[in-house]
Amino acid sequence: MTISALGINHKTASVDLREQVAFSAEQLDAALQAVRNLQGVEEAVIVSTCNRTELYCRGEVSGDLLLGWLTGFHKLAPNALENHHYHFQGEQAITHLMSVASGLDSLVLGEPQILGQVKQAYQAAKRQASVGGILERLFQQTFRVAKTVRNETAVGQNAVSVAYAAVSMARHIFANLQKSKVLLIGAGDTSELVAQHLKQQGVTEILVANRTLQRASEMAERVGATAHSLSELSELLPQADIVVSSTASTLPIVGKGSIEKALKKRRHRPMLLIDLAVPRDIEEQVNELDDAYLYTVDDLQSIISENIRNREQAAREAQVIIQQQTKEFNDWLKSLNSVELVREYRTHTKTLADEQLKKALAQIEQGKDPAEVLQRFSHRLVQQLTHKPTSLLKSAGENNDQYTLAVLQQLWSEPSSDSSKGK
């Protein structure tokens, strides 16, 4: 009952290659059925996101078979994934899944979205009946591990992107961030990320000012903000408790004078200004004004660097949790293997006994002496039951296989007097 994991991710493959190997929602059901039809595969789950595509399987299946299937399904050249994939089995595969779900293998260490994506992959596989008892238990335990990692370590805490760091700073400065009015200058990717993070924090009043009104309108529609032209800046600044600027301008857009005027109109209610642009959008002299608090991307970067160090330490703590849970699952899996072996051995023994008993009863019915029949029955049964152990003993002796000899010796060794006393 081997667990296997094969895939590619942001560490091993380019965006272009990851896009070619990703499974769309429309492809997923057929892909799951196709994987299940591979020789040796008993259960399967496919995790496919923008940063990774991974196959998790239970069964006796080779990495080459899985790799060949993945390459063929997406109609890639036979060696397209040769140097870009990874393949784990057993404990390594279990540890990898738990690390992925906990955010330890993500592009941004500790990001929480991956857990939801793994859950969706598991649910999709359940709907296709490609999850059985083993993967069911593995994924449920993985979800518990990810929750424990999130609750007991700081791996998902502290900002590690400039956009999120800006919002985190605003949250610490403004106790009621939800009631603050925020002005975003610029309508690029960074400004949009800031807007998304603000929305997640409950901010409802967001203004977007951009040189081209159309682009401001497009972004405002996506994030639920109001769009303005940059020419309206002097009217917008007094309304803003928080200003976040991120444009591609080569010259400052916001000067000391404009903030001074805005503060007067605000009756000197404080303003937080965060300049994410390089070169700067906001004049450095703004810091000379009372009630104006200016932070630059360099200020945020030092916070981010410290937070990354904190997350890396938390990741090491998380790995301890994952290793413990991997061992627990693997021990359970091994116990199933031994139970299955015992069941097979008993079934085999009973089959042999039943065959000999059937012959013995037939001979007795034919009038043969029961004592002689039973003696032959006993002799034949012993021969059949000892044939394989005898062959193993001979082979072990010839090859000086001390381990096998010791194991076989335990089959008929009497318990020591010391051990029997302790019972």
From Swiss-Prot:
Keyword NADP applies: yes
Gene3D superfamilies: Glutamyl-tRNA reductase, N-terminal domain (3.30.460.30), NAD(P)-binding Rossmann-like Domain (3.40.50.720)
Note: During catalysis, the active site Cys acts as a nucleophile attacking the alpha-carbonyl group of tRNA-bound glutamate with the formation of a thioester intermediate between enzyme and glutamate, and the concomitant release of tRNA(Glu). The thioester intermediate is finally reduced by direct hydride transfer from NADPH, to form the product GSA.
Entry's EC annotation: 1.2.1.70
Gene this protein is translated from: hemA
Protein source organism: Idiomarina loihiensis (strain ATCC BAA-735 / DSM 15497 / L2-TR)
Pfam families per record: GlutR_dimer (PF00745), GlutR_N (PF05201), Shikimate_DH (PF01488)
Site for Important for activity, residues: 96
GO MF, any single term: glutamyl-tRNA reductase activity
UniProt-recorded name of the protein: Glutamyl-tRNA reductase
